[in-house]
C-alpha cells in the first residue's frame, strides 16, 4: 500500500515522503497512529502542491539572503571605545555588539547567532563573517578605534 508519511518513521522515511508499506503495517500501525495517510490521488496532489510551495519559499529566501549579502559587502562597522594599557579594551566586542552596530549604523537587523567573529579585545581592524543563509555568507570590516 502506498502511504504519505506525516511524521518521520525510522524504518520508512521522512515526513512528506511517498513510500510503499505492507498493507497490515499501514492499516494497523501507521494510519491509526497518525504517522501516515493513504496515498490517494487527492492526497498526492496536495503533497506535491506543498512541496512546490516550500521550494518556492526557499528560493525566495535565498534571493533575499543574496541581496542582503550584496548590500553588506564592503561595509565597515566602527567602534569608538575607551582603552587601557597596550591598546587593550575595557571589556570586549562580541557578535552581539556587532549586531547592534549594524542596526544602529545601517538599519539592518542581523541575528547575533549569524555573526561569526572572534572576541575583540584590542584596537585594530578585524573581519567578521555573517552567515545569512546556509550557502550565503559575507564579510564585514570591524574597526576598533580609541575614543
Curated annotation (Swiss-Prot):
Disulfide partners: none
GO BP annotations listed: translation
Coiled coil, from the record: none
GO function terms (MF aspect): rRNA binding; structural constituent of ribosome
Keywords: Ribonucleoprotein, Ribosomal protein, RNA-binding, rRNA-binding
Keyword flag RNA-binding: yes
A Gene Ontology term for the protein's cellular component: ribosome
Signal peptide positions (record): none
InterPro entries attached to this UniProt entry: Ribosomal_bL9, Ribosomal_bL9/RNase_H1_N, Ribosomal_bL9_bac/chp, Ribosomal_bL9_C, Ribosomal_bL9_C_sf, Ribosomal_bL9_N, Ribosomal_bL9_N_sf
SUPFAM superfamilies: L9 N-domain-like, Ribosomal protein L9 C-domain
Pfam families noted in UniProt: Ribosomal_L9_C (PF03948), Ribosomal_L9_N (PF01281)
Family annotation (Gene3D superfamilies): Ribosomal protein L9, C-terminal domain, Ribosomal protein L9, N-terminal domain
Function: Binds to the 23S rRNA.
Family indicated by similarity: Belongs to the bacterial ribosomal protein bL9 family.
Name used for this protein in its record: Large ribosomal subunit protein bL9
Amino acid at each position: 500500500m502506498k502511504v504519505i508519511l506525516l511524521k518521520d518513521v525510522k524504518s520508512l522515511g521522512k515526513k512528506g515522503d511517498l513510500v510503499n508499506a505492507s498493507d497490515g503495517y499501514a492499516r494497523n500501525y501507521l494510519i491509526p497512529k497518525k504517522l501516515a495517510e493513504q496515498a490517494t490521488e487527492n492526497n498526492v496532489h496536495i503533497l506535491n502542491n506543498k512541496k512546490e510551495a516550500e521550494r518556492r519559499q526557499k528560493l525566495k529566501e535565498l534571493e533575499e539572503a543574496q541581496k542582503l549579502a550584496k548590500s553588506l559587502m564592503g561595509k565597515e562597522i566602527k567602534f569608538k571605545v575607551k582603552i587601557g594599557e597596550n591598546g587593550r579594551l575595557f571589556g570586549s566586542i562580541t557578535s552581539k555588539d556587532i549586531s547592534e552596530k549594524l542596526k544602529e549604523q545601517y538599519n539592518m537587523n542581523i541575528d547575533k547567532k549569524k555573526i561569526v567573529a572572534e572576541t575583540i579585545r584590542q584596537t585594530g581592524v578585524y573581519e567578521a563573517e555573517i552567515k545569512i543563509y546556509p550557502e550565503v555568507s559575507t564579510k564585514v570590516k570591524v574597526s576598533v578605534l580609541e575614543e
